[in-house]
């Protein structure tokens, strides 16, 4: 007997699906591959949890983020069975699964959603191959890692091995928050997707106030940061040292601040993240270690102390601002010429020539963005991801620093990108 969709949605605490969610779920149910460029806070998890509930077959979600796995396990434990696998163990409700439970999953008697790191997925080839007829979907989160300079790239590019594992491969859903058309095409080719359905939501948003300012010295920067702080705030920094320096300076001015970077112990990072989530810390100075998988909806301000490494990273990071309904967000980049020196140092550490060239191209995009003082910033973002650098449609967000200057230099856009 078919269960009405509204019954599943009620279990998930939803009244209806977004148009794009409905299109993705329908495509999964029809056995189609999908690529989704979906912004932070869109509700990607619904797109693979719901097919699992409807089909009552196992869904595998590949993600590099252990924190995301644990968050999803807490969030959906009352509506489906969530298994996490980021080591040699497989856990159910924070306990290692028994031999009988693992056998039931393998035999299809215990359909579940299995969260796995890409490395763990690749190491379980024989087990996953044996489950073929019980798997309804393989979802690959943060799929832009296939083309990006990150610690996850090698394991992500190896995921195409799965195409040889199955007689009839389950549909693949590859999703990310931001990606250019070049990246999307690369993902589709590497994963060997078959005529994928492409779902794309524009990165432009009308509730973000974007601005760029030049930083002269530390004292000047702290003054600007203090002026920009509104509500819950993240200050993204390029180095671990800067996170501590900025946090200490803001504490001196009476802010309840903290810092977060990969050099801290897991226990300390979890503690800081929890305090920030609960509002016990007003301002968090952080490196990009406080990044993918962070699910905090009431962040009001994102400040970059130094330019991000590329436009993709920048849009992922500002996408964490103003995610609640009717909320207005403030996003500001503080930059200096020295930031490009730091980016070039990181660039030289990339051994892969092709990847190094791609990263250099992406860095050029953010460099043009921060140096521009004429054209609508939201338009620059839109055109970067669409690859339409020569557009002359006169789009203006009327909410960024360039638009607020009430100047129109549309005809200069082509020369800016040459």
Model-derived segments and spans:
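C-terminal accessory/connector segments of nucleic-acid motor ATPases
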Residues: 351-418
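Gly/serine-rich nucleotide phosphate-binding loop at the start of the catalytic core
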Residues: 60-61, 256
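Helicase motor core with emphasis on the C-terminal RecA-like subdomain
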Residues: 3-11, 16-19, 23-45, 53-55, ...
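Amphipathic alpha-helical repeat elements characteristic of tetratricopeptide repeat
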Residues: 2-3, 360
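Conserved Rossmann-like nucleotide-cofactor binding loop
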Residues: 67
């Amino acid at each position: 007997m078919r269960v009405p969709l509204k019954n599943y949605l009620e279990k998930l605490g939803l009244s209806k699906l977004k148009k794009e969610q409905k299109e993705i779920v329908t495509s999964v149910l029809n056995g189609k591959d999908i690529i989704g460029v979906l912004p932070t806070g869109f509700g990607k998890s619904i797109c693979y949890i719901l097919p699992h509930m409807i089909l009552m077959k196992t869904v595998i979600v590949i993600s590099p983020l252990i924190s995301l796995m644990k968050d999803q396990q807490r969030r959906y434990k009352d509506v489906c069975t969530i298994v996490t696998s980021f080591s040699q163990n497989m856990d159910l409700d924070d306990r290692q699964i028994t031999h009988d439970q693992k056998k039931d999953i393998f035999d299809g008697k215990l359909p579940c959603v299995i969260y796995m790191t890409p490395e763990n997925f690749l190491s379980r080839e024989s087990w996953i191959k044996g489950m073929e007829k019980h798997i309804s979907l393989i979802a690959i989160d943060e799929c832009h890692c296939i083309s990006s300079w990150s610690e996850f790239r090698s394991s992500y590019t190896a995921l195409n091995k799965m195409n040889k594992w199955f007689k009839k491969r389950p549909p693949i859903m590859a999703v990310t928050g931001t990606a250019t058309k070049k990246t999307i095409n690369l993902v589709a080719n590497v994963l060997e997707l078959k005529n994928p359905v492409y779902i794309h939501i524009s990165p432009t948003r009308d509730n973000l106030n974007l601005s760029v300012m030049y930083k002269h010295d530390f004292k000047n920067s702290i003054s600007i940061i203090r002026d920009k702080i509104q509500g819950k705030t993240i200050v993204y920094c390029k180095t671990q040292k800067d996170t501590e320096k900025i946090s200490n300076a803001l504490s001196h001015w009476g802010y309840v601040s903290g810092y977060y970077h990969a050099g801290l112990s897991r226990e300390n990072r979890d503690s800081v993240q929890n305090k920030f989530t609960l509002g016990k810390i007003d301002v968090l100075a952080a490196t990009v270690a406080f990044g993918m998988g962070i699910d905090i909806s009431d962040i009001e301000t994102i400040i970059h102390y130094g330019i991000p490494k590329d436009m993709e990273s920048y849009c992922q990071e500002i996408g964490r601002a103003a995610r609640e309904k009717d909320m207005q967000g403030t996003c500001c980049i503080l930059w200096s010429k020295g930031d490009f020196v730091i980016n070039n140092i990181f660039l030289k550490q990339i051994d892969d020539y092709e990847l190094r060239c791609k990263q250099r191209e992406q860095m050029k995009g953010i460099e043009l963005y921060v140096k521009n003082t004429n054209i609508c910033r939201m338009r620059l973002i839109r055109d970067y991801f669409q690859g339409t650098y020569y557009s002359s449609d006169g789009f203006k967000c009327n909410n960024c620093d360039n638009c607020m200057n009430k100047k129109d230099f549309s005809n200069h856009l082509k020369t800016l990108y040459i």
